[in-house]
Amino acid sequence: MSKEDMIEFSGTVMELLPNAMFRVKLDNEHSILAHTSGKMRKNRIRVLAGDRVNVEMTPYDLTKGRITFRFK
């Protein structure tokens, strides 16, 4: 799947879950499970509850996503 096929949303991290997973509430009031992208892990960018994030999701599974950016 190419990067152009991904859907981007903004949301807020609601809770931290085990195995580096996060519960994210999107701006459209949906709640999804998300993990951080590889570049965020490599650069040790911390994500905490209450942070605003960008999430990209595949159109095939709209319940899971990848956190690609944390707003300051």
Swiss-Prot record:
PANTHER family: TRANSLATION INITIATION FACTOR IF-1, CHLOROPLASTIC (PTHR33370:SF1)
Domain of life: Bacteria
Cystine pairs: none
Physiological role: One of the essential components for the initiation of protein synthesis. Stabilizes the binding of IF-2 and IF-3 on the 30S subunit to which N-formylmethionyl-tRNA(fMet) subsequently binds. Helps modulate mRNA selection, yielding the 30S pre-initiation complex (PIC). Upon addition of the 50S ribosomal subunit IF-1, IF-2 and IF-3 are released leaving the mature 70S translation initiation complex.
Keywords, ordered alphabetically: Cytoplasm, Initiation factor, Protein biosynthesis, RNA-binding, rRNA-binding
Localization (cell): Cytoplasm
Protein name as annotated: Translation initiation factor IF-1
Taxonomic placement: Bacteria, Pseudomonadati, Pseudomonadota, Alphaproteobacteria, Acetobacterales
Domain called S1-like: residue spans: 1-72
GO molecular function: ribosome binding; rRNA binding; translation initiation factor activity
CC terms in the record's Gene Ontology section: cytosol
Homology family: Belongs to the IF-1 family.
One Pfam family of this chain: eIF-1a
Subunit and interaction comment: Component of the 30S ribosomal translation pre-initiation complex which assembles on the 30S ribosome in the order IF-2 and IF-3, IF-1 and N-formylmethionyl-tRNA(fMet); mRNA recruitment can occur at any time during PIC assembly.
UniProt organism field: Granulibacter bethesdensis (strain ATCC BAA-1260 / CGDNIH1)
